């Protein structure tokens, strides 16, 4: 493949004079380019929705969401995966981020790590990949061998696969069941895909993980009711969520949360139904953790 023909590698005619610009104009040019990202992502929403549904299906069947990528793409996957346990109360390992070159590549580039298809396969083998897992390959260029190898192995293993790339009709898209390709155009700094391409990938990942967790019962209204209250800020947020979802006073909300070890879902159910903590937990379990269903039935 001639990499110079990739949209993400071509020069942007609107930023050819970056090195001659005064600082206010320089940052204005960056911002002008960034405004195009949301529109590019918008064009992919039907495919993003399919990916969300695939992620929900994986979770409901006992599978995992596994992101894999190299460089910026890999770091974004690891970032999104690492935010899921505190935000949604899911166990570590339910959403996994793999980066070419291993954890050390998060902080320091590992030269050549992305160039091995076998490494992508090996990393999935090490995770004991199961057919109910969803594998999401991330590569701005759409041709990273590490990701191609991983997606190919995942498909051979019976997994549903998703490819997220910022070039049209990319090699990784051809390896996936679902292709998400927000084409953001040439970068302001030629080939620096940590810019618009990285932003687009982050937006897509936000929707996949958050959408999946909404559909998996981790959200009530627009509240993260399975959040782990692990610090002062989050304890305060837990109290506010109970108050906002039920209309009770803060003091009563704190009393209920102390009875539930600061778990928000049972506290809301207790406030709205009069159940005690044990009965509230039991009712939630009977409705697979979906608070709305527990309240309506």
From Swiss-Prot:
<dbReference type="GO" id="GO:0097367">
    <property type="term" value="F:carbohydrate derivative binding"/>
</dbReference>
<dbReference type="Pfam" id="PF22645">
    <property type="entry name" value="GKRP_SIS_N"/>
</dbReference>
<feature type="active site">
    <location>
        <position position="114"/>
    </location>
</feature>
<dbReference type="GO" id="GO:0016803">
    <property type="term" value="F:ether hydrolase activity"/>
</dbReference>
<keyword id="KW-0456">Lyase</keyword>
<protein>
    <recommendedName>
        <fullName>N-acetylmuramic acid 6-phosphate etherase</fullName>
        <ecNumber>4.2.1.126</ecNumber>
    </recommendedName>
</protein>
<comment type="pathway">
    <text>Amino-sugar metabolism; N-acetylmuramate degradation.</text>
</comment>
<dbReference type="InterPro" id="IPR005486">
    <property type="entry name" value="Glucokinase_regulatory_CS"/>
</dbReference>
<dbReference type="GO" id="GO:0046348">
    <property type="term" value="P:amino sugar catabolic process"/>
</dbReference>
<dbReference type="GO" id="GO:0016835">
    <property type="term" value="F:carbon-oxygen lyase activity"/>
</dbReference>
<dbReference type="GO" id="GO:0009254">
    <property type="term" value="P:peptidoglycan turnover"/>
</dbReference>
<dbReference type="InterPro" id="IPR001347">
    <property type="entry name" value="SIS_dom"/>
</dbReference>
<feature type="domain" description="SIS">
    <location>
        <begin position="55"/>
        <end position="218"/>
    </location>
</feature>
<feature type="active site" description="Proton donor">
    <location>
        <position position="83"/>
    </location>
</feature>
<dbReference type="InterPro" id="IPR040190">
    <property type="entry name" value="MURQ/GCKR"/>
</dbReference>
<dbReference type="GO" id="GO:0097173">
    <property type="term" value="P:N-acetylmuramic acid catabolic process"/>
</dbReference>
<comment type="subunit">
    <text>Homodimer.</text>
</comment>
<dbReference type="InterPro" id="IPR005488">
    <property type="entry name" value="Etherase_MurQ"/>
</dbReference>
<comment type="function">
    <text>Specifically catalyzes the cleavage of the D-lactyl ether substituent of MurNAc 6-phosphate, producing GlcNAc 6-phosphate and D-lactate. Together with AnmK, is also required for the utilization of anhydro-N-acetylmuramic acid (anhMurNAc) either imported from the medium or derived from its own cell wall murein, and thus plays a role in cell wall recycling.</text>
</comment>
<comment type="similarity">
    <text>Belongs to the GCKR-like family. MurNAc-6-P etherase subfamily.</text>
</comment>
<dbReference type="InterPro" id="IPR046348">
    <property type="entry name" value="SIS_dom_sf"/>
</dbReference>
<dbReference type="GO" id="GO:0097175">
    <property type="term" value="P:1,6-anhydro-N-acetyl-beta-muramic acid catabolic process"/>
</dbReference>
<keyword id="KW-0119">Carbohydrate metabolism</keyword>
<comment type="pathway">
    <text>Amino-sugar metabolism; 1,6-anhydro-N-acetylmuramate degradation.</text>
</comment>
């Amino acid at each position: 493949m001639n990499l110079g023909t990739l949209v993400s590698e071509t020069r942007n005619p609107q930023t050819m004079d970056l090195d001659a610009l005064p600082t206010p104009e320089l940052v204005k040019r960056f911002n002008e380019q960034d405004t195009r990202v949301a529109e590019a992502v918008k064009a992919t929403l039907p495919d993003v929705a399919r990916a969300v549904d695939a992620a929900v299906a994986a979770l409901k069947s006992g599978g995992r969401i596994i992101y894999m990528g190299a460089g910026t793409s890999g770091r974004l996957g690891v970032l999104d995966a690492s935010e899921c346990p505190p935000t949604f109360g899911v166990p570590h390992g339910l959403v996994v981020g793999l980066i070419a070159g291993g954890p050390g590549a998060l902080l320091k580039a590992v030269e050549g790590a992305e160039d091995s298809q076998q490494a992508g396969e090996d990393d999935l083998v090490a995770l004991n990949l199961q057919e109910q897992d969803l594998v999401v390959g991330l590569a701005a260029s759409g041709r990273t061998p590490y990701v191609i190898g991983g997606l190919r192995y995942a498909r051979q293993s019976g997994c549903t696969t998703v490819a997220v790339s910022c070039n049209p009709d990319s090699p990784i898209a051809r390896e996936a069941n679902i292709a998400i390709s927000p084409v953001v155009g040439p970068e302001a700094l030629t080939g620096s895909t940590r810019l618009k391409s990285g932003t687009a990938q982050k937006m897509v990942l936000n929707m996949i993980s958050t959408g999946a967790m909404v559909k998996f019962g981790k959200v009530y209204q627009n509240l993260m009711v399975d959040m782990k209250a692990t610090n002062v800020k989050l304890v305060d947020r837990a109290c506010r969520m109970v108050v906002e979802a039920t209309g009770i006073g803060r003091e009563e909300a704190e009393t209920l949360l102390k009875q539930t070890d600061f778990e928000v879902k049972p506290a809301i159910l207790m406030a709205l139904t009069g159940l005690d903590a044990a009965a509230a937990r039991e009712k939630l379990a009977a409705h697979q953790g979906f608070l709305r269903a527990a309240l309506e039935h």
